[in-house]
């Protein structure tokens, strides 16, 4: 008989940051790791394998279970990934960019901030693709040394980038067609926004590649990397698969390199998975 190895292409492994929230179902009420399923669906529909990355802590004892270990835990998690999505959510703590909190700024969530900053640092260290959405884009800017406008509606000439409580606002954005995400979406796009904060001082090493009509920064990239993109809008809300697909494809290249390295190390061993042909 002739034995032929089975090779099954694997989906790029995409980590999605999540948050902790109080949820209830049936008779139960618990703090849970939460994330809108639209993120998961968009990653899966774009060919990726979504993996959730919740911040770890102990709500009952009121302390963080892994205090001081965020960097090492994030490095372990990111070592398993081909790409990272920093998802939307609550305001970033202004203390991270050395400013006092505005009256309109939401309460700090140090557990999530520390965890996602550690995930981002580990992803950049491994140079895997990063897609940062809304809060994620703001956190990315802060990680690069930038700051935020804490309440955009208070700025003269600025539009409200929300459509009302729990309602996304459709807004046109102008994009640089020669840079991400414009190379994927074109020179302009109508997007779904829901943010009251925005990027103020741009982080070192980042480039603005998209703006709203009022001048608000809506897209930024680290041009020194193959794919490190932040968008202020919510592509998952519209199931905007073009951006997710470009991201997952970039992550696929990381997976292919890793798979090739593993295969090279295993060339001396016969495959354990075989098909026998007469």
Where are these regions (language model features)?
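N-terminal beta1-alpha1 cap of cysteine-dependent amidohydrolase-like domains
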Residues: 1-129, 142-144, 149, 153-182, ...
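Conserved G/P- and acidic residue-centered "switch" motifs that form tight phosphate/ATP-binding loops
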Residues: 134
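Hydrophobic, aromatic-enriched interface-forming segments
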Residues: 137-139
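Active-site-proximal beta-strand elements of phosphoester/diester hydrolases
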Residues: 228-233
């Amino acid at each position: 008989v002739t034995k032929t190895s089975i090779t099954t292409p694997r989906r790029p492994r995409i980590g999605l940051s999540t948050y902790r929230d109080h949820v209830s179902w049936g008779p139960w009420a618990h703090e849970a790791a939460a994330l809108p399923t639209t993120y998961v669906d968009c990653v899966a529909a774009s060919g990726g394998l979504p993996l959730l990355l919740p911040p770890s802590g102990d709500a009952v004892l009121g302390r963080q279970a892994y205090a001081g270990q965020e960097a090492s835990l994030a490095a372990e998690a990111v070592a398993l990934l081909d790409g990272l999505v920093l998802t939307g959510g609550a305001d970033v703590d202004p203390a991270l960019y050395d400013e006092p909190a505005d009256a309109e700024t939401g309460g700090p969530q140090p557990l999530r901030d520390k965890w996602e900053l550690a995930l981002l640092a580990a992803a950049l260290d491994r140079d895997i693709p990063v897609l940062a959405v809304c809060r994620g884009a703001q956190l990315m800017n802060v990680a690069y040394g930038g700051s935020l406008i804490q309440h955009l509606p208070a700025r003269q000439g600025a539009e409200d980038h929300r459509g009302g409580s729990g309602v996304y606002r459709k807004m046109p954005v102008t994009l640089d067609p020669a840079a991400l995400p414009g190379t994927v979406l074109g020179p302009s796009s109508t997007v779904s926004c829901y943010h009251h904060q925005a990027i103020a001082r741009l982080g070192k090493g980042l480039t603005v590649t998209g703006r709203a009509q009022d001048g608000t920064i809506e897209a930024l990239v680290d041009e020194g990397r193959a794919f490190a993109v932040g968008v202020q809008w919510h592509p998952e809300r519209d199931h905007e698969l073009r951006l997710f697909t470009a991201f997952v494809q970039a992550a696929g290249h990381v997976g292919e390199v890793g798979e090739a390295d593993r295969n090279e190390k295993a060339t001396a061993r016969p495959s354990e998975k075989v098909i026998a042909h007469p």
